[in-house]
Amino acid sequence: MALTTSNEFKTGAIAPDFTLVNTVDNSLLSLTEAKGEKGTVLLFICNHCPFVIHVNTALVQMANEYQAKGINFIAISSNEIENYPQDGPELMQQVAKEQNYPFPYLFDETQAVAKAYDAACTPDFYVFDKALKAVYHGQLDDARPENGKPVTGQDIRNAMDHLLENKAVLENQKPSVGCGIKWR
């Protein structure tokens, strides 16, 4: 599996708005509608990437914990599906149900949202404050498939905890690592 690291997304940048199909219930959902009262975590993921599969359980646990605190999670898959049909909307819905995703799983068919965020890999994590200003863009933690490190979500947890405690933005933000987004 080829490794791709996330691109830089400037701290303080405003999250570009979007409206996409939520594959969980086939409704249209915008960032404005789905954002959290205290913050929002945007994650670019897909069904087939081993890096995403490796952290799925932790994502569900973390989302359940932090959504109760006012930080909503929104997952987006932007992979092209002609060559990667396993990342299509029907299978996204199936994965969301099997994994018990407590968050919307949106399909970015045109890849415009991934381009607006300069997303590069799956998983790719962005944390925004209540005004949708970027406070974090980077990795979940140091765990990778087969490196033996436990999935803790420590980097994202630190960013969300700083946000909830009104502390300064974390300066040391390690890029996310995963499968490259499958562009058209």
Question: Can you describe what each PLM-predicted range is?
Answer:
Residues M1-N172, G180-R184:
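Chalcogenol-based redox active-site neighborhoods
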